[in-house]
Amino acid sequence: GAYICGDETALIKSLEGERGQPWSKPPFPAIEGLYSKPTVVNNTETLANVPPILMNGADWYRTMGTEQSTGPKIMCLSGHIKNPGNYEIIMGDMTYRDLLFGEDYGGGILGDKELKAILPVGGSGPMITPEALDAPITYEGLKPFGSDMGSGSVVILDETVDVVWAARKMAKFFEHESCGKCTPCREGTFWMYHLLERIEAGNGSEEDVKTLVSVAEQIKGKTLCALGEFAVSPVVGTFKHFANEYQLKVTGK
């Protein structure tokens, strides 16, 4: 199904042959899910951890990682990185610096350019800057920097990237993937994309930037599923760290 089917209730609707749209909970899938039967929905990585836990026991599994982030984790590196790919790590045993620059992992920034920013959850989470490189790779490690590890889909942006361009690309994705069921997400993603398109083209104003941030804030906490929350991340994250680039687009200075 579509990206929206990352929401468990939308996935269930898709499996039933209906349009992949989330429903308002309750009822929760564990009570009333697929064909109105109790349903447990987990992702593939979670299910892959079940057999070794059954074979070796929960205590064995808890010897890996931290108290809050237990076990191994598959991290995906993409973007401006020398060695893109999937890497299995033990949570808490390494930092983002180790992951990006370690010879057995990312190997450094492509073309030996400077690192500008990291999308630790792809477009679905707030951007971080090089100051967070020494944060441990755990679910809690990026909280001091206002972000999180999420699914571990790490996208690297080098010094040449126009962050307004990057935000516009991500906003377009979320506008396209919104199922349209709830108004804040449907209308919010539409306006965020078109405002970013105008700003990136050099036709925006300072008022457009204010409206963009306001629209993003209005989406938060008002959507049926997490897609709407994810959609504001490109705007909030880029504006938090690179407000000067927005200013340059609309004022030329």
Regions found by a protein language model. Name each.
Residues T70-P72, K113, D148-G152:
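Short, solvent-exposed loop/turn segments at the edges of secondary structure
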Residues Y96-L99, E114-L115, S178, M192:
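Extended, hydrophobic alpha-helical segments in both membrane/secreted and soluble proteins
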Residues G1-M91:
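Hydrophobic alpha-helical positions that pack around
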Residues G92-L110:
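Short amphipathic, charge-patterned alpha-helical segments
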Residues G1-C5, S36-N43, G85-I90, G108, ...:
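Hydrophobic alpha-helical scaffolding
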Residues G108-F145, K240:
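Terminal amphipathic helices with adjacent charged low-complexity linkers/tails
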Residues I4-G17, W23-P26, P52, Y87-I89, ...:
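Short acidic, glycine/serine/threonine-rich loops at helix termini
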Residues P136-K253:
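Ferredoxin-type iron-sulfur electron-transfer modules in oxidoreductases and energy-metabolism complexes
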